[in-house]
Amino acid sequence: RVALLNTVRPLCPDVPPDLLQDFFVRLDQEYFQRFTPPTIAEHVRLTAKLTPEHLCEVAFADQPDHRCVITIVAYDYFSEFAMICGLLSAFGLNIEEGDIYTFAEKTAPLSSRTSRNEYGPRVRPKATPGLAQKKIVDVFRVQPVPGVELGRKQQHQLADTLSSVITLLDKGQFEEA
């Protein structure tokens, strides 16, 4: 993965190094075999936009055959996948294919102390907000059912609705979601 990381790094120069490293360490090998470096960089940039106040990012890529690739990057919550699929269906989108990835649990960071003889408070490096939380990268290939449009207006509505649902999940309000 080091070679791939070195290929992706220049494609997302504004992403903090700890976030880029976390992305590469916590996603499994299958993810990195499935996507190209430019696509991985786009997913990294979407992940970099997540904060405890901004829980998800949605990107739409219109395809020439009236299909659309929808990428959802968010913090991971119980029942989230079912909610996403239900929401796509409620918007009249037939899910033809989905690539679903969840970050592995974060391992405990190494202590900043270098020996047992060192005293005083530990100095913690400034961490990216939300870095330790598990995240998802879900990529859906969808096609609107006959009579349904997925223009910019509908894309914006879908992203807003998804954000509202994920906010409810974050608050533990599963029934309301």
Report the location of each language-model feature.
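Non-catalytic interaction/regulatory segments
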Residues: 1-177
